[in-house]
Amino acid sequence: CVARVGDVFEVPGARVHILMCYDQTAIRTGGGKELLPFEECCCSFLFETSAGNIMFLGDTWYHDGYVKVGKEYDIDIAIFDMGFNAPGATDKMTPYDAARLGQTLRAKVLIPDHYDNWVNCAGDPDLIINQFERIVAENTPEIKTVIMRCAGRFDFPKDQDIKRYRYPDGSENYDVSKSVYGNKD
């Protein structure tokens, strides 16, 4: 099955809309000199769930076409790529464009990805995240940012104010009373 822009289907727990993705890299990878139409080579996914609407944009660049998406859909969470690009290798949004994308989509929570794990990111992940958080906080304080870690769990709306994910320390599984240092009555 191939996802096509405009498709809508159901999966357990969600209704999925296949939406436009404006990945300028993807439209250049067809092998010829002609640019491919966006809708033929890339797409975004909007998951409508009982907890809220999650938009996964995958790899994309900022594009004014997202204004229409933000007007047509209520987006609670936007997940997108972000990084710095080496000269001549633009592949990801900068922190500024990522913040602008969140504003354009009218998203409530922004979760960037790829900023910490790709060789062509060409930047210090902490610097990228600090800049992103500052740009969002100063320009669109109504939008929240959440910085996840690999294999971390995010539950919306409960976790929307965590800012930066922290791995559980396991203390919820400890029974101090069974320890030699625990309280003995």
Enumerate the predicted regions with their spans.
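Generic domain-boundary/flexible-linker signal
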Residues: 27, 88-89, 121, 156
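Core dinuclear metal-dependent hydrolase active-site scaffold
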Residues: 2-71, 152-185
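Metallo-beta-lactamase
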Residues: 40-97, 108, 113, 117-119
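Binuclear metal-ion centers of metallo-dependent hydrolases, dominated by the metallo-beta-lactamase
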Residues: 1-8, 95-185
